Amino acid sequence: NLDVQRGSITALIGPNGAGKTTVFNCLTGFYRASGGNILFTSRNKTTNVIQVLGQKFQPGDWINPAQFGQRLFYKMFGGTHLVNRAGLARTFQNIRLFREMSVVENLLVAQHMRVNRNLLAGIVNSPAYRRAESDALDRAFYWLEVVDLVDCANRLAGEMSYGQQRRLEIARAMCTGPEMICLDEPAAGLNPVETHKLSSIIRFLRDHHDITVLLIEHDMGMVMEISDDIIVLDHGDVIARGKPAQIQHDEKVIAAYLGTDESEVTL
């Protein structure tokens, strides 16, 4: 059982193979959970992630037309786009940018669900279409400013340094207009200066945009510095959760990381 408080920075930590990325993949629809519930409560509504991805038909569906119709609808039209539309975005362990596109083009593509793409409006270049295009560009440059990449707007994404690409991924995710963002090892491979800059960006998301951040990270210094809450996984189970100061001295957590029994841990 795992829950994340709105407007917080919550770190999901644990040894390699604990199931952290699997949790992200289930939350965002890249894996389809075989059971249980994944509920994402935004400001406007609650989305059942498993449901909108398209669940298997159940025997009881045949005697419940409404339930059958709902399940059939999501089977036909459901998918990860509905998870994103509900307000959930993510980044990946391995950077996944459109490398042959410019930096700003990466951010414009991310807004395809928010921009008026009506074919007729585009053909006649209507005022609404031009306004939507202008708003998308303004939004892209706003997030480029937040991640300190305005000067790189017209460079190819594939030509950027590793640290810059990491920040661009966050900007691209934010252009989808999420209420919650899942960051999968965003500081991996970064030097201390880049990690500090990244930490400032993550705090900015929480403090100025009320974004809920769920973070997987192996840099314990960063985790302890920026997290409001920490959840610790080991072999797929939550073994501890609490404030950073509590987690630092939790015997179960120390045992999991050191590969020892709790009885062998001396604090």
Which positions does each model-derived feature cover?
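Glycine-rich phosphate-binding loops of nucleotide-dependent enzymes
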Residues: N1-L267
